[in-house]
Amino acid sequence: MAEDSHMQKQLEFQNGSLEEGFVVRSLENEPQNMMESLSPRKYSSSLKFKANGDYSGSYLTLSQPVSAKRSPSPMGTSVRSSPSLAKIQGSKQFCDGIDKNISMKPPISFLSSAASLGGYPLGKADLDHYTGRDSERSTRLSEKPPYSRYSSRNKSHDSVYFLGGLEGRKTSGSLLTMWNGNSLSCTGSSPISRSGAASMPSSPKQVRKMNLQDHSTLQPRLSRHKEPASENVSVRTRKYSGSSLSNMGAYSRSLPRLYKATDNQMSPLSLPPRSSLGNSRRGQLGEKDLPHSLVDSDNYLNFSSLSSGASPYKTCLSEGNPYVSSALSVPASPRVARKMLLASTSSDDFDRASYSGTSPSHSFISGEPDRVLVARRNFSCGSMELDDSDLESLRQSSETPQPVLRERKSSISSISGRDDLMDYHRRQREERLREQEMERLERQRLETILSLCAEYTKPEGRRLSAGTTVADVQKINKELEKLQLSDEESVFEDALVCPDARYRCHRKGSLQDVDVAGFGNLGHSASFLAPRGSRSDELLGDLTRTPPSSSAAFLKATNESSYLSILPKTPEDIGEEQRTQELAAMEDARMVILNNLEELEQKIKDINDQMDESSRELDMECALLDGEQKSETAELMKEKEILDHLNRKITELEKNIVGEKTKEKVKLDAEREKLERLQELYSEQKTQLDNCPESMREQLQQQLKRDADLLDVESKHFEDLEFQQLEHESRLDEEKENLTQQLLREVAEYQRNIVARKEKISALKKQASHIVQQAQREQDHFVKEKNNLIMMLQREKENLCNLEKKYSSLTGGKGFPINPNTLKEGYISVNEINESCGNSTNLSPSTQFPADADAAVTEPALAVPVSQPQSSEHFRSLEERKKQHKEGLYLSDTLPRKKTTPSLSPHFSSATMGRSTTPKAHLPLGQSNSCGSVLPHSLATMTKDSESRRMLRGYNHQQMSEGQRQKPEFYSRTASESNVYLNSFHYPDRSYKDQAYDTLSLDSSDSMETSISACSPDNISSASTSNIARIEEMERLLKQAHAEKTRLLESREREMEAKKRALEEEKRRREILEKRLQEETSQRQKLIEKEVKIREKQRAQARPLTRYLPVRKEDFDLRSHVETAGHNIDTCFHVSITEKTCRGYLIKMGGKIKTWKKRWFVFDRNKRTFSYYADKHEAKLKGVIYFQAIEEVYYDHLKNANKSPNPLLTFSVKTHDRIYYMVAPSPEAMRIWMDVIVTGAEGYTHFLL
């Protein structure tokens, strides 16, 4: 213990001498140190999810050795950091003294890359210093058994390891081999070497449970090896040692992998130094306290090693630097930290089970673990502001008992209701917004300070803007002070809401006056608790020179930096600067108004073009419809003419048939009159014959005979003529019916066509009227838009006039200077935003740099460099790769806008405070409701000037220096490689380079992408994030959509026509089927009527006594038929029968004159007639009966024949016109004639069932 006390006093003395040297050198190096300590801070957002990879230009070489006070803790030392290289060089002598005590230990080879602090490389003294500390480190490592947790998943995620001092454990591992150290087994070490990354529990309760187990396991080991640790441990001056990484296994495994620097990289980039509040607190702990490796300081990502103390078991030496250059950066937002905390699921349970199962006999005291999480809870609000009560608690913390382990409060896991969650989100969001604004203003101030320093290197004639820059810095300081005060109030308010969170771990150490420098180093470690590590470096750096008396003095010392005392400030200069700034702001506003005027005029021109195009389209469509309507009307007229012609043809057919019938009737009437005259003459002569004398009787008889023959001939001729006339009439009726039906079908078809054409003409008329109405509505809409744009144009002109008047009044009648270069038109793309963010990663979107700069007007000291073309190409390819994720977010962000390039950069002027100078008189043109329909028509004109804009940007790219080109390239590499990690969690790749932090994301409608789009009036210069490629892609998509719409309309029209044709065919087919069905129905009805007629007919006679029905076969043998019927033809000489004919005498009763006369009858199947002659010579034909007219042949059983010569031999032949009564000479002859005649009775259909 005495030796420990002596070592502590010697360390304090050394720290005092180092701080004196630091004060001397700080005035010379402060401007450069601040810029170089600021630049590593840029990596915090883009490196926190660094994926596994190895490349040059790595960013995690953080080996910064500093002197620190030794902690009496047996297994750990406190960490003291120094912001200057002077401390490191001054600590060489002290470390050399320590090396003498441990010279007996084997040396350790130094393989890590040279560390740097703020960009300064280390010299030989620093290497010696490293070697001494490494030797001391290996000495202590050789005396205790290391412990390493092993997990394959942890190993795949991290490269962070820690050693544990457990007895009987035969494993070895490197002490936090994150970058420089590779674990190697040395001579005599165990052949088994296991190492693994610590895992994080998935909940705070699990953390406490594991810490309890860790305490219970390690407490006996502490008491057992306390003496060797106090004897062998040496002073460590490593800033990022294992002691600054407490409880790594309990809190995260989602750390960026750390790799060894390449050989050709002599001075890699470094992150800003970080220490911990717990480190300063542990500097005052005694031996009774828990090792600082288990007492977490203040953050999610502080980890610790259990191998900080000494151990008698030596198993391995760490090759290279056994210390840690930590790249643990603060999560960009609490949401990301929450993801990291929840990343570990079950691996920690496995590790804890194996850990506790390995040595169950060792355990900690159960009351100790409550020290682990207290400090972390106190800083859940996201900022570390120290007031008097905090400092007092720090001084008295060594005597204060530790609080009992309690349930975690004021965290996201303790929120149960939706209202609480929304309130928590609102507070966190407001706090992060304040932090971003403070970071932006501080960065702006530091850039202005750097430009001030650059002004002193110029001649006196060039120092025109020094006063303006000083005024800028003053205004930025005021803004910073306001934001810091509001931030401090929010922190106090959160502490009042959660009183338990105010119980901090500051009580664990006393903060005396001599420890102010140590308190400043503590601020560097806790800088992640301040807003994104932006201002706490400067806050706590000022505390190393000025002890804080109160929170107000603390903020004032922070804001009023010593850099502002470089130039003198006078009221005249400030007034002139304000006037110059007002004039510059007015010139910028004039440029914006002129650009808006140009845009409005272009939009009015586009609307006029659209109106003309709409009018031309209307005329074209109306002309097309009119032509189609005319063609349909012409076809309709033709069909009507054809229909009239068909009707006339039907009428003429009827007239012709009636005329033919009339002619035949007239002819028949004439023949009838002639026959009647002959009959009258015959009757007169017959009367004269009865009255004439006997002498003239013979002559009169001869004359009467001649008249009788003539009467018979004429009667026969009249009957034939009458029959022919009847046949002709029936034939005419049949022809008339056929022709009429055909014509009627044609008439019906043409009528349907006429109806369809009338409907089509009506539809065309309706379509034409609808198109006219639609065109009228579009015209009214265009007129309304044009009027709105004209009103906006008038307002802009009025604003321009007012601005010119104001400028003239300020300048004494002078007008605005003419600068044609300020009227360049361009598109703000995502690449240009990325280029501007390459120089300032955490700038908010409202402070992005312009891509075009006027080199002739812009001052060289205030010129803002942009990214190099290679970085632009990389970002463009990156955007193409992520188009699927972002396409839905930027579809509304494709309007072109103007970019103004003022003579002085507006982003660092006091008039604008880094914001856009767009006037808020009206909404941006891209957001105007009246400009919504201009987008598709204006897309075609957007790509004309793309080549000239690329050349213009290429000219400005040549103005950048080599050092300024390396930073964006590095950011592009780190952002592109981080996409692998982000895509694995299914996050849309924001690249962490286009924006500061997405602090507006409780849901997607509140994210930065939607906030940066055109949703506020002052985003006209930064709202659009689309480049020329996206505009061309949008134009192509619009063309494809238009073509698809046209194709769909055409296909729909074709489908409608096909459906209409199908319906017409179906209708026609149905009509044909219906007509056929009607015909079938009518025929069936006729058949049914015939059957019913046979059944219902009151038959006046029975079935005729014939056994056969008519025979119509051509090869019919009449003779054989009669013989087959049973008749003996040879014995009946009254009848002569052949194969086709049958002849014989029969007595026939006359038709009109009921006289019985003997006639020679001939039945001829060849002629198909049954004719009778006067005698057997067949010279004088008396009458003809056609087979078609013969209906029935039957025996006269009713005795209807009047005055029949022999009623027993009388039979009847029934025809259509009359009934012929005949008397056969014998019964056999009667039966033969009846059977013969019935074979020709083709009109015999009543019994044809």
UniProtKB/Swiss-Prot annotation:
One of its GO terms (biological process) is basement membrane organization. Residues 267-283 have a biased composition (Low complexity). Expressed at postsynaptic membranes of skeletal neuromuscular junctions (at protein level). Residues 1139-1242 form the PH domain. Pfam families: PH (PF00169). It is a peripheral membrane protein. The modification Phosphothreonine is found at residues 546, 570, 894. It is found in: Cytoplasm; Membrane; Cell projection, Podosome; Cytoplasm, Cell cortex. The keyword Phosphoprotein applies. Seems to be involved in the assembly of the postsynaptic apparatus. May play a role in acetyl-choline receptor (AChR) aggregation in the postsynaptic membrane. This is Pleckstrin homology-like domain family B member 2. The gene is Phldb2.
